[in-house]
């Protein structure tokens, strides 16, 4: 199915691109989420009429993400978790725990933005973690996992 992208989508394209995707991806995700429209003549004309408005909205979203990225870059976030004598955690530190610690520090973040390529953190220590605030704004933070006081 051919669609018009209404925002930048990683791996697909930029605002205004006409791309071909699988029918299910378009019908079940992109179109209901407001990220795309079918590439019909009427929708193409409507998009061209709204192009400046959509570009301004995307620029505003990117500027907000860049501002949050500058606040986050280089920050150290501490997460306390119960741990054994050998430094291994009882349980693990997930992206939800890290997002909650970032929010507690006063910066907006959701768990879907926190990238843990090697899975949840399972030991005490410091870890480099990426927080993807936008496809063009990725902040690198340090997560310090410490043993919680009994």
Swiss-Prot record:
List GO molecular-function terms, semicolon-separated: rRNA binding; structural constituent of ribosome
Could you mention a single GO BP entry for this protein?
translation
**Organism per entry:** Neisseria gonorrhoeae (strain ATCC 700825 / FA 1090)
UniProt record similarity statement: Belongs to the bacterial ribosomal protein bL9 family.
**Family annotation (PANTHER family):** 50S RIBOSOMAL PROTEIN L9 (PTHR21368)
Identify this protein by name: Large ribosomal subunit protein bL9
Gene3D superfamilies noted in UniProt: Ribosomal protein L9, C-terminal domain, Ribosomal protein L9, N-terminal domain
What keywords does the record list, in alphabetical order? Answer: Ribonucleoprotein, Ribosomal protein, RNA-binding, rRNA-binding
């Amino acid at each position: 199915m051919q669609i018009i992208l209404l925002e930048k989508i990683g791996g697909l394209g930029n605002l205004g691109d006409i791309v071909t995707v699988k029918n299910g991806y378009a019908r079940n995700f992109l179109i209901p989420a407001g990220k795309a429209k079918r590439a019909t003549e009427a929708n193409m004309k409507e998009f061209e009429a709204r192009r400046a408005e959509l570009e301004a909205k995307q620029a505003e979203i990117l500027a907000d993400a860049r501002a949050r990225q500058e606040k986050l870059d280089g920050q150290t976030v501490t997460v306390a978790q119960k741990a054994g004598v050998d430094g291994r955690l009882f349980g693990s530190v997930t992206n939800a725990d890290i997002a909650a610690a970032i929010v507690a520090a006063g910066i907006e973040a959701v768990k879907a933005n926190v990238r843990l390529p090697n899975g949840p953190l399972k030991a005490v220590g410091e870890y480099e973690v990426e927080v993807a605030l936008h496809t063009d704004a990725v902040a690198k933070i340090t997560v310090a996992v410490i043993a919680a006081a009994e």
